Amino acid sequence: MSVMAAMGGAQVLSSTGAFADPAPDAVAQQWAIFRAKYLRPSGRVVDTGNGGESHSEGQGYGMLFAASAGDLASFQSMWMWARTNLQHTNDKLFSWRFLKGHQPPVPDKNNATDGDLLIALALGRAGKRFQRPDYIQDAMAIYGDVLNLMTMKAGPYVVLMPGAVGFTKKDSVILNLSYYVMPSLLQAFDLTADPRWRQVMEDGIRLVSAGRFGQWRLPPDWLAVNRATGALSIASGWPPRFSYDAIRVPLYFYWAHMLAPNVLADFTRFWNNFGANALPGWVDLTTGARSPYNAPPGYLAVAECTGLDSAGELPTLDHAPDYYSAALTLLVYIARAEETIK
């Protein structure tokens, strides 16, 4: 699917108000469960699967969910918490992690670009939904710094770096394709009309198409791009898996109507080889080995919207084992609601 086709879809959604009011009752109901389980009164979203830490990703997800459900009070509390505790003073990006009880609570000032893009996506949508132009200006400021600070050339690609520090090697750059939050990149182009966003999206589509490995032709959690030639390989230093991070790739590209038919076909083949009752939590892209445990409900929700034949109703957040599985599930609820509206 071309970027221009996806952009046209995004502009239709924006102009018809679907971005401004995408929440049927199901989304609002699931948000209420997420809010009760993972949002603290301070506005801090808690990652229960990682020792109760918080991060820019979680704040972005929470803000996006609240905007989708029309919950302005919760949105404001999460945005204020993120600005106060995570946003940099020298740019508009966000430190990636907050550790309650530690001194300092933000020991690492490095950003996580997906968190930045999720917060900007939430701000842009909240600005439209709640008629708050200041939120849209905040989103545009974040997008400007992501574009200027987090993109670079690697071979034939303009790539989106995962963070400011730690991902540039002598001969390669390390990417996380799940950090390409495609609905946010579409919104960035829609708000700014900067053609550089089009290049980032087009190259993101190319990277997802070319950067797939193993018998199932799946993207790895971490991908290396040769800085001179653009050759792609599974990054060393991480398990060579399709797992915790890469599970978001089909979701984000489906949501933005950018999931190419051949890529969708490979995901569909993978999901249905195992089925809903035996889908692995990870698969090794070099050996084909699978996790000894099955995928949590959030992974099944992603599979359900990208080709799993045996799926039934979407899981509810009542049964989510932790924050991340719940977040994936609620993202699917929102993506499906917007598909229905479109």
UniProtKB/Swiss-Prot annotation:
The keyword RNA-binding does not apply. Its EC number is 3.2.1.4. The active site is at E57 (proton donor), D114 (nucleophile). One of its GO terms (biological process) is cellulose catabolic process. Its main location: secreted. It comes from the Bacteria. GO terms for molecular function: cellulase activity. It is found in: Secreted. Keywords: Carbohydrate metabolism, Cellulose degradation, Glycosidase, Hydrolase, Polysaccharide degradation, Secreted, Signal. Disulfide bonds: none annotated. It catalyses: Endohydrolysis of (1->4)-beta-D-glucosidic linkages in cellulose, lichenin and cereal beta-D-glucans. InterPro entries: 6-hairpin_glycosidase_sf, 6hp_glycosidase-like_sf, Glyco_hydro_8, Glyco_hydro_8_CS. GO terms for cellular component: extracellular region. Residues 1-20 form the signal peptide. Enzyme capable of hydrolyzing carboxy-methyl-cellulose (CMC). Belongs to the glycosyl hydrolase 8 (cellulase D) family. This is Probable endoglucanase. It comes from Novacetimonas hansenii. The lineage of its organism: Bacteria, Pseudomonadati, Pseudomonadota, Alphaproteobacteria, Acetobacterales. The gene is cmcAX.
